[in-house]
Amino acid sequence: MRSALGILLFAATLSAQTQPPVRDQRTFRTGIELTSLTATVTDKAGHLITGLPRDAFQVFEDGERQTVTQFTNERVPIGLGVLLDISDSMHGKRIEDARAAVDRFLFTLLDESDEFFLIAFNHKPRVLTQWGRVHDEVTRALVALRPSGGTSIYDAIIESMPMVEHRSRQRAALVVVSDGADTASNATLRDVRSALMRSDAFVYAVAIDSPEPQPINTRVNPQALREITNESGGRTEVVQSSADLDAATARIAEELNSQYVLGYTSSHASDGQFHSIRVRVAGAEYRVRARNGYVATR
């Protein structure tokens, strides 16, 4: 999550919450170990809380209070990867609904300062578009999709990691859309969790869990997806039908547009060890979602 893992070093303007977010590339400085966090704050009912000041936040690493040195409650541009299931079970209306939801999500609900890439996966992942936001290119890629084969969610996430690392935007996120359990990956759930500990990306998943009878080993596994998303600071949306994809991705977009970005200089060295992170809002009954830790790469 630091140094070679794309730890963000904010421009000085980000420390002033009245300033607009910087919209150019991330910057790096040798020898500075600034750890960056993206945090989502909600009330008990799940409503997003925006506009909190820096001093409302407390950050703990391995139980030790850290000093928040960089902060913004303004929207920060994001580099986002969409990982779309095109296994055989996504045929017909499901792929049609997925195409429409992804298009609306990327070009209507996100900000023009954001960039993204697309990966489709069945028995293996395939990069459809590189970083950018060219509407015609995305449309052609989505229209050309023909569902077939198995499901390799874990391989798709692993495949996306180098692309996330080489983004030009400050925040990083992945959105996985799938209707099935992983049946074809070489990577394991443990491999994915390990990779995400070394990345600053947070992960969202939209799981289509149809009430229709399906073979047990192919039905979507929300618990496995939650293990991935919750640890990274994201979350899993479970929907009953592909018709609900629009609403689910709209909720994710609203969250991406309402997050806080915090930075602190860790009191720990880059020792190759896992360090836990906890973020809380002092004096308020709010819930804060952020990654639960990272591996400090040497």
Regions found by a protein language model. Give the residues of each.
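Hydrophobic h-region of N-terminal signal peptides that target proteins for export
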Residues: 5-17
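Scaffold/interface architecture of coatomer-like assemblies
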Residues: 16-298
